[in-house]
Amino acid sequence: MTYLVLLLGLCFVLGGLAVASNPSPYYGVVGLVLASVAGCGWLLSLGVSFVSLVLFMVYLGGMLVVFVYSVSLAADPFPEAWGDWRVVGYGASFILVVIAGMIVGGLIECWKVGVVTVDSGGMFSVRLDFSGVAMFYSYGVGMFLVAGWGLLLTLFVVLELVRGLSRGAIRAV
């Protein structure tokens, strides 16, 4: 089980690196799906099945829509592939940053955080992840509204930036 969790953590980091160093939106989707599956599998191994399922639905439902939209706007006839030197350089530099962060974190010893599973507090009638979701929606209403307005503003800003001189892949007829 330990090796499975370590493998899921490695896949999560590699998926994040693939999203960060993607040469085109076509390949960014692969990294996003890898990171999403690995992160939700990691949460599932800790016993947080409901939150893992909700996050999986949100990531693959919402973020793939964004990637499909960006793919339709970036109609490259010859997209950059993973083997290009610029993409390999980005990936190598991101891996070096992650390794340096692990070394510095190990030297400072700030990683003294224990992993607690959902059922570790004893016997409860309601699992902790379900009660956490209820608190998430009851006490977090203001933050949800602020995050929703922020995402709406971000959508309009991105649409305005991408529009440019209306000479993109999608043109008004």
From Swiss-Prot:
GO molecular function, one term: NADH dehydrogenase (ubiquinone) activity
Functional description taken from the UniProt entry: Core subunit of the mitochondrial membrane respiratory chain NADH dehydrogenase (Complex I) that is believed to belong to the minimal assembly required for catalysis. Complex I functions in the transfer of electrons from NADH to the respiratory chain. The immediate electron acceptor for the enzyme is believed to be ubiquinone.
Subcellular location: Mitochondrion membrane
Top enzyme category: translocase
UniProt name for this protein: NADH-ubiquinone oxidoreductase chain 6
Organism: Calidris maritima
Similarity comment text for this entry: Belongs to the complex I subunit 6 family.
One of the record's GO cellular component terms: mitochondrial membrane
Its membrane topology: Multi-pass membrane protein
Domain of life: Eukaryota
UniProt xrefs under InterPro entries: ComplexI_Subunit6, NADH_UbQ/plastoQ_OxRdtase_su6, Nuo/plastoQ_OxRdtase_6_NuoJ
Residue stretches spanning the membrane: 1-21, 27-47, 48-68, 88-108, 139-159
EC number(s) recorded for this UniProt protein: 7.1.1.2
Annotated keywords: Electron transport, Membrane, Mitochondrion, NAD, Respiratory chain, Translocase, Transmembrane, Transmembrane helix, Transport, Ubiquinone
Pfam families to which the protein is assigned, alphabetical: Oxidored_q3
Reactions that this protein is recorded to catalyse: a ubiquinone + NADH + 5 H(+)(in) = a ubiquinol + NAD(+) + 4 H(+)(out)
